[in-house]
């Protein structure tokens, strides 16, 4: 690891000998350290069962619920799990060091809904669960291809912008153990059904606690769905998954009256979008242009599949 990475590891209390590097010639990167912390085993002082932190693909014992310390003052204390501690550190670092700007927008998606409805039964025969997320992953790839300045990160220590030639899209996955972001690697080379199958597989690993550091490192940007729950959201202000430079929040689909070609109001499904980006790398006008491209791809899935 380079000196800056070693200093970063020391500041996080991480032993570099426990990490397998994903950089050139096996070098350890900041992303490797962040991924290791996100999937770290609980410390011995915590009342939790051990989980693997190496590249082993074994199923860990279930993490037990921390026992609260009772108090007569109307308060209670609970130990944070190692995962929660790592997430808290990472999120705090982002909000205190990265100037994040969020753009809120919407897109009409009737063609996308119809396209998925036509394909979902066929997808099932090919062992693919076709939700809207694979479309959104491909739309992010197509957007990054048209806007290559979006596909990068900031290295403040070196005073450099680093741009990627790969298109790796993270998909935020909620589990009982916390939030994980497995990465769809080389998403530009995969079909809609391939991405659907991989999302299902990575989600299963996240819920089982068997994701590796390699599964969660090297992302170009992240997609997070706040509209897929019983109490689904509309817009949000998502925090970027550093060192990535952008994250796309997907809200619920809602029917709204929109004018047709003759100006007559017609009920159409509309998806809410929350696009957050690192303003050090991306200017506002470029971010809006990229978001407009993404909206076009979601509005026209035939164009999306032709471009990506």
Q: What residue ranges belong to the model's regions?
A:
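ABC ATPase nucleotide-binding domain signature region
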Residues: 1
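C-terminal catalytic/motor cores of large multi-domain enzyme assemblies
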Residues: 4, 8, 12-15, 27, ...
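Catalytic-site-adjacent helices and loops of nucleotide signaling machinery
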Residues: 21-22
